[in-house]
């Protein structure tokens, strides 16, 4: 009986281990080749399994991947949730168990419809089904597209495909390569290993191609203020003015910058409470031929709260006034952090469901760029930068930079902020726009239009990042077309693989 149980569990156990190894492909480890090997091992593990066996193998792979890959979420739950250890572990386990459903959906659907390890199934059907599972994970219940495999390739030769089809194209190419490796191992057809080799070589060749044109005549000096404010103290009434003056004093030392940027919710007060201060800040920035961008919390006349971005100083908005139509309001809110699903049921249960600032309203999906000192910027607040389609649709022909403000203090010294930066870099590469990322305690950095970090400052330090950024002109294919070519590819691949299967079985 023990031998039978071990026989049943050995593949799921192996899958969980392989899934956990996948985290090594992402920041801060960035062993990008792992993202090619671990999906191949998953395809090999489900070979010859029944649908029921495959679903558990895929689920175990997902448990391993997300238990290791999003372990940083526990830092926030334990540090700010106000619940006992058992409740913290339960919530973390529930999140991991939910996310593992999507790899299980992939393995079940593959074994259900394309069980045979044919070349067509592994190179077309498997990548298509993987993308569908990823899309569902990025959409269901507001979506959580973290750890999409393509993000791990930001520094690999495959990164050159990102301006063509975005991070999803990189995921597709990884799965095509993984399918070829699995086919080679299962059928001992080692010539199939040429496929991932060709993909990587093609990516290297594409790295010399630039889809957009830099505009050196519009080079801009920016100063990013990293306040390093303790999250436990930030919203205490006694800390309001010390925090505000900290950012103000650091800005005064950098008035020679064209644009000074503060992080998400840098001002620990409602905008409506600070009209005199903001008016004076606006005047000071104008006097110094500069502009300041900051995250701030807003309350509208109807009582709704917004996580917002404002710009003062040299802007097209005129003298400072409390006008919410001239602000960017965060659209994609963080579940439980900025809104609570099933609010009336969950809020009374535990402090975790009643965190400060967890009743925000959404801004529009597409909003005007923030303009500072003549430079339009496509904004994304914190978590929004992981939603590629939202960022893409907010970039216009006039956009000079991508702007993302964040506060990753919730996640301490975990790997979460490093993965967050990795994702932000991908947005710059996809859209061919330099990226400005200003945070409370790191990672604060700027990148060029290829997603390469130009300058950064260490985490957990009060510091100012000075850099010069060069805007670009033109559009990448991904900016123009989005993911539609991939949707078509997925449909055609599944249709072709299904037709071939029916013809073979006839």
Curated annotation (Swiss-Prot):
- Which compartments does it reside in? Cell inner membrane
Give membrane topology per the record: Multi-pass membrane protein
Q: Where is the CN hydrolase domain?
A: 225-471
Give an example GO biological process. lipoprotein biosynthetic process
The keyword Calcium belongs to this UniProt entry's keyword annotation? no
Matches recorded under InterPro entries: Apolipo_AcylTrfase, C-N_Hydrolase, C-N_Hydrolase_sf, LNT_N
Family annotation (CDD domains): ALP_N-acyl_transferase
Active site annotation, chain numbering: 264, 330, 382
Gene3D superfamilies named among the record's database cross-references? Carbon-nitrogen hydrolase (3.60.110.10)
The kind of enzyme this is, by top-level EC class, is: transferase
Q: Which Pfam families match?
A: CN_hydrolase (PF00795), LNT_N (PF20154)
Q: Which E.C. number(s) belong to this protein?
A: 2.3.1.269
Q: Name one GO molecular function term.
A: N-acyltransferase activity
Its primary localisation, in coarse terms, equals membrane
- One Gene Ontology term, aspect cellular component: plasma membrane
Q: In which pathway does it act?
A: Protein modification; lipoprotein biosynthesis (N-acyl transfer)
Keywords, A to Z, come to: Acyltransferase, Cell inner membrane, Cell membrane, Membrane, Transferase, Transmembrane, Transmembrane helix
Q: Where are the transmembrane segments?
A: 26-46, 66-86, 89-109, 113-133, 166-186, 192-212, 479-499
Query: Which NCBIfam families does this entry report, sorted A to Z?
Result: lnt (TIGR00546)
Quote the function comment for this protein: Catalyzes the phospholipid dependent N-acylation of the N-terminal cysteine of apolipoprotein, the last step in lipoprotein maturation.
Q: Which family does it belong to?
A: Belongs to the CN hydrolase family. Apolipoprotein N-acyltransferase subfamily.
Name the record gives this protein: Apolipoprotein N-acyltransferase
Query: What is the species listed in this Swiss-Prot or TrEMBL entry?
Result: Vibrio vulnificus (strain YJ016)
